Amino acid sequence: MASLRSATALSRLRSRAGQQSNLSNSVRWLQMQSSADLDLHSQLKEMIPEQQERLKKVKSDLGKAQLGNITIDVVIGGMRGMTGLLWETSLLDPDEGIRFRGLSIPECQKLLPAAKPDGEPLPEGLLWLLLTGKVPSKEQVDGLSKELRDRATVPDYVYKAIDALPVSAHPMTQFASGVMALQVQSEFQEAYEKGIHKSKSWEPTSEDSLNLIARVPVVAAYVYQRIYKDGKIIPKDDSLDYGGNFSHMLGFDDPKMLELMRLYVTIHSDHEGGNVSAHTGHLVASALSDPYLSFLAALNGLAGPLHGLANQEVLLWIKSVVDECGENVTTEQLKDYVWKTLNSGKVVPGFGHGVLRKTDPRYTCQREFALKHLPDDPLFQLVSKLYEVVPPILTKLGKVKNPWPNVDAHSGVLLNHFGLAEARYYTVLFGVSRSLGICSQLIWDRALGLPLERPKSVTLDWIEKNCKKAA
């Protein structure tokens, strides 16, 4: 059966690769299929020595190779675009968008197992891909699904820690407090205190990471129920997968909403290592802080208005358009409202990206989902109009490198359609999703023995004294 599944999937990929004249995709996929009979832990245990040797060889052969010049503009500009991190799980291309272990979002949708035929990829499949670089079988994904369900037990003191906060506290504050309380059970901290050898530290890191990934949807769902509903805990459904169960525990059982949550978690899981949340998690973990502490720090970065709060602000802005112009807003009215926003010194939320220079493929796959499941939704139709109206206006301004929509331009409208309309909560959904990418990389940080992060800083005085003016 395994060989039949592989042959069928390979046939699909060869057809797709032929259409795109890209044979490398099928070659890469063949490489990724080795050791398909092993469970997740066994695969990691087999891979890690090979990757450790690979890293040693890279350091030996290429350690002195230069990656580029750093200018003062880069130093005072947030290190934007500076290559300075090793991040194995994903890579962001300015034109193609994110690739998870070399696979684009459309390729992941094609190759990763789904809950139903032609459905969205299961987040467990992406987690397997991020950790191993291999496309899992449906049986492997089902096994990982069960493992995560078995790990998804949250102690009572976690709920009590959240309950100690006012209900009015921001959802991210309550979510972060719950994650902090989970840290009490850290296996990495216990192993470190007992003197675990550095070469084995990836194993308790893996245990913590899988426990954390399994439990954060439970904590997040409780935060939602506490703030917006009756405060009751909806138990997990052992027949459902990770994304489906998250939707269920939030109180949404529409099959289309379950599919949306699978897609949402998958595409929000990772976006290489330089964004605030990913970099923060990596930085804190480099001090040998356990995965709970590291992910908590990442969440606090994600809560910032310039990072994870953007998806919240998009829906609020779109609703403000409807409030002022009505649902049947004309193109001219929409142009006027966009200019009004820009002339007031604000940005149009959901457009532009620090790295991407084309439409975010995460936006595109959400648009395809909407066209399939909710083509007549008024807010979706408004988002479609914005796609036509906003980029030309931003291009005309001449100050924007990327006028195209990003992932945040669409997600709120989809969630709102199925009843999850509380925009203030959206960053929590983002946080749950990002646990997959951050924790996967933390395991590899420990497996590869990556060092403490310690860049050099300078003062304005130092710059003025030591740097000559550019010619």
UniProtKB/Swiss-Prot annotation:
Catalytic residue positions: H307, H353, D408
Pathway it works in: Carbohydrate metabolism; tricarboxylic acid cycle; isocitrate from oxaloacetate: step 1/2
Enzyme class: transferase
Organism: Citrus maxima (Pomelo)
Subcellular location(s) of the protein: Mitochondrion matrix
UniProt main location, coarse: mitochondrion
A single MF term (Gene Ontology): citrate (Si)-synthase activity
Keywords: Mitochondrion, Transferase, Transit peptide, Tricarboxylic acid cycle
NCBIfam families: cit_synth_euk (TIGR01793), PRK09569.1 (NF007128)
GO annotation, biological process: carbohydrate metabolic process; citrate metabolic process; tricarboxylic acid cycle
Other remarks on this protein: Citrate synthase is found in nearly all cells capable of oxidative metabolism.
E.C. numbers: 2.3.3.16
Family membership: Belongs to the citrate synthase family.
Protein name: Citrate synthase, mitochondrial
Gene Ontology CC terms: mitochondrial matrix
Residue interval of the organelle targeting sequence: 1-18
Lineage: Eukaryota, Viridiplantae, Streptophyta, Embryophyta, Tracheophyta
Subunit composition and interactions: Homodimer.
Substrates-to-products reaction catalysed: oxaloacetate + acetyl-CoA + H2O = citrate + CoA + H(+)
UniProt xrefs under Gene3D superfamilies: Citrate Synthase, domain 1, Cytochrome P450-Terp, domain 2
Cysteine-cysteine disulfides: none
Segment forming the signal sequence: none
